[in-house]
């Protein structure tokens, strides 16, 4: 009996040579590390070394998160991934009325260079790669990181890492935007230019499908809308006067990995192929690195359950395997208790151990792209590619990603798919172990990690002390220069860095830009 994939595509019970009738491996596959990069962006992939194990972490104060990072490094993690709290993500200080009740809850609270210094205390920034999940205020957090590196005596040329910096998906699926799309894209172009000149090894953006998938996007929707956003960013940078080969090699992507292994592997392979062709054929990129879709993967939090949470260990292992078989460059495996609360030290360690088992106790790293030539995976790769290209065409017909966002196209498509998933789960047509089948009569108690509510008062006290100690005249002058740059065409990151060095807060810098650029107010898409 034919089944339907997450993207609504048929999965036949048996595949044979007829599934690939007329299929040209030279056109569709190529060699690993070669155009169109279907088989992976590097010739040897994991046969030389495994993917980067980058565990996402951050909660409470900078002191608490610093201790967690040091523990992760001691446990063998290869790169840090910083989670920020909602006030930081929205450009508000911890003592702002709107921040009440959210300080330190879903990530670490960072208000100034003082907090950033504590966050990375004892962690040599020339020895670790750091990813920061921050979007609308990404420029600020990058500059704070650079300032702390300078205090450590580390030159910007030695800094490696990534800022997410993908604001378009915030309008589609997540909501942590600050400025309207126009100024937001201008700020992203300024970041591209700044990093090329000042922090050349930094990945300037992580164009993200993960959040769309968590909101309900199918695999085909996930890569279609993500790549459409990527096209918008490339056009923005080119329009700002940059050569495509000057910035495209530093672009990166971020996808989800679900338990549906076959379609997930197909999705990753299709995304690489589409992006390579877009960059070559539409933008005329010449540097092979400009054609490579390098991506980070996080296992699907939306598939984790609060019921029988230990079963999530199995889900995460399967999701991680799908990401590895699909050729991810780095991976975060969720902790089994994340459907309940922030992970404990033990659950975070188990999540990392899951990756280590995949890397060192299986044979998936022994050969490149193990599914190459598989009837089912090659057919599904073609099918996902076709479905994604059709959605990308619809975005283009609306005028590109920004215009499609204003029409509510992506959001509506994702919400329709999310509703379908909810209906199938409620009816038990879609089996979720422990939720609609194989339930327990009584759940075992589980004690989650709890964030101390006193953190909010602690952060407010730190801010009061900072404002009392700093040179307010220097702060005011720097913020005035920032407003002037934002009003004109100068790169805003240079005066922004001066303001942050003078100990202006994240909220003060964002408020200065709000005065010039305004704040985004969403329109009803329905």
What positions do the PLM features span?
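Generic beta-strand/beta-sheet core signal
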Residues: 54-56, 82-85, 131-135, 162-164, ...
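Short beta-alpha connecting loops at secondary-structure transitions
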Residues: 101-105, 169-179, 212-217, 255-260, ...
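Flexible glycine/proline-rich, aromatic-decorated loop/lid segments
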Residues: 243-247, 285-299, 307-336, 343-368, ...
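Catalytic alpha/beta active-site cores
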Residues: 1-258, 263, 282, 289-296, ...
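Generic secondary-structure signature for well-ordered alpha-helical cores
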Residues: 78, 121-125, 150-155, 189-201, ...
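Flexible, glycine-rich loop/tail regions that form catalytic "lids" or insertion modules at the edges
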Residues: 3-22, 31-37, 86, 344-345, ...
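Extended, hydrophobic alpha-helical segments in both membrane/secreted and soluble proteins
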Residues: 141, 230, 253-279, 295-321, ...
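Phosphate/diphosphate-binding loops
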Residues: 111, 129, 134-137, 149-151, ...
């Amino acid at each position: 009996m034919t089944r339907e994939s997450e993207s609504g595509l048929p999965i036949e019970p048996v595949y044979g040579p007829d599934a690939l009738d007329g299929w040209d491996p030279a056109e569709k596959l190529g060699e690993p590390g070669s155009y169109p990069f279907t088989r992976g962006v590097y010739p040897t992939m994991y046969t030389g070394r495994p993917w980067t194990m980058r565990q996402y972490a951050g909660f409470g104060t900078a002191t608490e998160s610093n201790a967690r990072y040091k523990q992760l490094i001691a446990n063998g993690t290869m790169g840090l991934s910083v989670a920020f709290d909602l006030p930081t993500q929205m450009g508000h200080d911890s003592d702002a009325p709107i921040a009440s009740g959210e300080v330190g809850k879903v990530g670490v609270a960072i208000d100034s260079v003082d907090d950033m210094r504590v966050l990375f205390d004892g962690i040599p920034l020339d020895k670790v790669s750091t990813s920061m999940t921050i979007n609308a205020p990404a420029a600020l957090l990058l500059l704070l990181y650079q300032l702390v590196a300078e205090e450590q005596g580390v030159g910007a040329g030695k800094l490696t890492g990534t800022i997410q910096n993908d604001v378009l998906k915030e309008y589609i699926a997540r909501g942590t935007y600050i400025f309207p799309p126009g100024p937001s894209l201008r700020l992203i172009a300024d970041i591209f230019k700044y990093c090329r000149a000042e922090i050349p090894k930094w990945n300037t953006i992580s164009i993200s499908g993960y959040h769309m998938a968590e909101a309900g996007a199918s695999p085909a929707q996930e890569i279609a809308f993500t790549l459409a956003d990527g096209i918008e960013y490339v056009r923005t940078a080119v329009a700002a006067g940059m050569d495509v080969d000057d910035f495209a090699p530093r672009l990166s992507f971020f996808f989800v990995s679900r338990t549906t292994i076959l379609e997930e592997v197909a999705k990753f392979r299709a995304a690489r192929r589409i992006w390579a062709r877009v960059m070559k054929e539409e933008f005329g990129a010449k540097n092979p690195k400009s054609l490579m879709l390098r991506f980070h993967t996080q296992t699907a939090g939306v598939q984790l359950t609060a019921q029988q949470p230990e079963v999530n260990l199995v889900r995460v292992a399967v999701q991680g395997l799908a990401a590895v078989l699909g050729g991810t460059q780095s991976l975060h495996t969720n902790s089994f208790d994340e459907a309940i609360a922030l992970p404990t030290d033990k659950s975070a360690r188990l999540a990392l151990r899951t990756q280590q088992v995949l890397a060192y106790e299986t044979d998936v790293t022994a050969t490149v792209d193990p599914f190459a030539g598989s009837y089912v995976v090659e057919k599904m790769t073609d099918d996902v590619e076709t479905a994604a290209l059709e959605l990308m065409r619809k975005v283009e017909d609306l005028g590109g990603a920004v215009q499609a966002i204003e029409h509510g196209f992506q959001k509506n498509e994702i919400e329709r798919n999310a509703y379908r998933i909810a209906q199938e789960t409620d009816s038990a047509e879609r089996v979720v172990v422990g939720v609609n089948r194989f339930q327990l009569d009584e759940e075992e108690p589980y004690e989650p990690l709890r964030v101390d509510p006193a953190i909010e008062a602690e952060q407010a006290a730190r801010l009061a002390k900072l404002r009392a100690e700093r040179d307010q005249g220097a702060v005011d002058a720097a913020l005035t220069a920032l407003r002037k740059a934002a009003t004109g065409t100068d790169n805003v990151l240079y005066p922004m860095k001066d303001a942050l060095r003078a100990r202006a807060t994240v909220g003060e810098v964002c408020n200065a830009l709000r005065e010039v650029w305004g704040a985004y107010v969403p329109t009803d898409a329905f």
